[in-house]
Amino acid sequence: MSSKVEYKPIQPHEEAENHFLQHELHKVKARKYYRCALVVAIIITLVFCILASQLLLFPFLSITSQTTETVLNKDIRCDDQCRFVLVESIPEGLVYDANSTINPSIFQSWMNIITNAKSSIDIASFYWSLTNEDTQTKEPSAHQGELILQELLNLKQRGVSLRVAVNPPDSPIRSKDISALKDRGADVRVVDMPKLTDGILHTKFWVVDNEHFYIGSANMDWRSLTQVKELGATIYNCSCLAQDLKKIFEAYWILGLPNATLPSPWPANYSTPYNKDTPMQVMLNSTASQVYLSSSPPPLSATGRTDDLQSIMNIIDDAKKFVYISVMDYSPTEEFSHPRRYWPEIDNHLRKAVYERNVNVRLLISCWKNSRPSMFTFLRSLAALHSNTSHYNIEVKIFVVPATEAQKKIPYARVNHNKYMVTDRVAYIGTSNWSGDYFINTAGSALVVNQTQSAGTSDTIQMQLQTVFERDWNSNYSLTFNTLSSWKEKCIF
């Protein structure tokens, strides 16, 4: 028997319910769709707002990044034919043997670049005391400093602009030269390094016409020309290097604005492609040279700039035969910190060079009435490494500038103020004393020159600086440290 299949027609109320369910299902799907669309729209809006905010708040962010990359990828070759002149101030009464090398004077170098300036002079300085009035003396030897000041005062009428970045003066007397310059049209900015880094602006350099420059140990002080032993370098016709040094000046200049703060990072226009890893390839005195400028402290160094301490340690580590150092102060401490802090960075690298590589290390350190007694304790520690049994090649001498009774009365004079180092590979001319404070929070700078590729040349800059060091080391003013029963016997007038 076949079964019957009955088909029940859908009742009207069932059909309505089915339509209702389908309608509700479409509504649920629609709500989900609209919710998803709303979420996507909100996300897109937020992203757009963030991007718009960045463009409004940091309009140069992407440009700065691209510019920095462009600066750092710049060709490190320079086509300038630069002329390098090693310059010195030899204090009156300090006389070398007849055959000794005497370099051109810092005074004559400054006069040359002032009188030949065509458009601009920028000077980064610690303080100004170019006249007898500044030091409350009546010294005929102040004449050179007074001439320098007069030439600088006359720049405006020659159409030459003068900018001066200077540390805050510590007394009204130290403000007189600056006030006179401002009255004659110079632009002066006081860089409040004590507030910015808890240090000082200790650097000493000039940039002239973006083409020539001086860098070295001499302050803007008449005593630095006739009563203090100084060393520096003047480089002529070298726009590549001059403009790179000017970037360091511009950093000081911007920090001299009211309520200035340290930028982090520095904008791209302060960056440099020239450093210890990629030095500038340039001709100095017709000799192929690798050159860069270092700076301290680290917060003042823009992208690409080698920090001054890193430069010094790298030069020591790079030496193969010898490291000769001539500085006023040497101490593995932070001299001005409270509480006291030990700071062995440079000291460790010197000991390592002696012990591991048998490098010959010589330190020629200044000795005068303002020397810190603690410095000699640390120097004795270095000198103790040298003995007939150890065969470690490290020697320490102190340099004493002689003084007459009249010269003893000149304040803060009669001292070897040099701040340089020379190795078998590199010449380093700086502006800082060698203790921790000068590299941690004090502004300084240095010129680093390597002419090793031209080892056959008889007059490389390394050789010139080595000659100066050996002249001083072998002079009657240099005393073997181990033979001194008391540093006070020789240093205190």
Curated annotation (Swiss-Prot):
One of its GO terms (molecular function) is single-stranded DNA 5'-3' DNA exonuclease activity. The chain crosses the membrane at residues 38-58. Residues 59-493 are lumenal. SMART domains: PLDc. GO terms for cellular component: early endosome membrane; endoplasmic reticulum membrane; Golgi membrane; late endosome membrane; lysosomal lumen. Belongs to the phospholipase D family. This is 5'-3' exonuclease PLD3. It comes from Xenopus laevis. The gene is pld3.
